Amino acid sequence: MNNIAPQSPVMRRLTLQDNPAIARVIRQVSAEYGLTADKGYTVADPNLDELYQVYSQPGHAYWVVEYEGEVVGGGGIAPLTGSESDICELQKMYFLPAIRGKGLAKKLALMAMEQAREMGFKRCYLETTAFLKEAIALYEHLGFEHIDYALGCTGHVDCEVRMLREL
């Protein structure tokens, strides 16, 4: 009898070969929540199919979660465009339904914020939408506080929930 244990999810840095897979995850999760490209959500970002190129720049980092050979989620950090140089943004945190509830988003967010600290950032900002209740609960648990105004120039005009955390 051959008992092969299922693989554990692996968190690793984004590679060029991951571009199509992580774009697919972001589009699928966005569709699940009704976050359409005609509005100011991540799914409308012009660089969605080129995330490796974006996150290979200094001050940027992105990780994917791979499970049984498939990319099932990801998230990253980048300097907050149009804001103070000590503020980064937690970006593009998306996970397929089958992998949610396993603590991976929390682990990834903590890892990203630690990397941001090491890069010299002092604060971490994020934008999301009220449709993503589970994500908001996670961010609150991680110490993010709601703020009443947008920071920077993210282009995500329909993301009405804005949060900030000291690193």
UniProtKB/Swiss-Prot annotation:
Top-level taxonomic group: Bacteria
GO molecular function: N-acetyltransferase activity
Keyword annotations: Acyltransferase, Transferase
InterPro entries, A to Z: Acyl_CoA_acyltransferase, GNAT_dom, NAT_camello-type
Segments forming domain N-acetyltransferase: 9-167
Enzyme class: transferase
UniProt keyword annotation of Phosphoprotein present: no
Known EC number: 2.3.1.-
A Pfam family reported for this protein in Swiss-Prot or TrEMBL: Acetyltransf_1
Family of this protein: Belongs to the acetyltransferase family.
Name of this chain's protein: Uncharacterized N-acetyltransferase YjgM
Organism: Escherichia coli (strain K12)
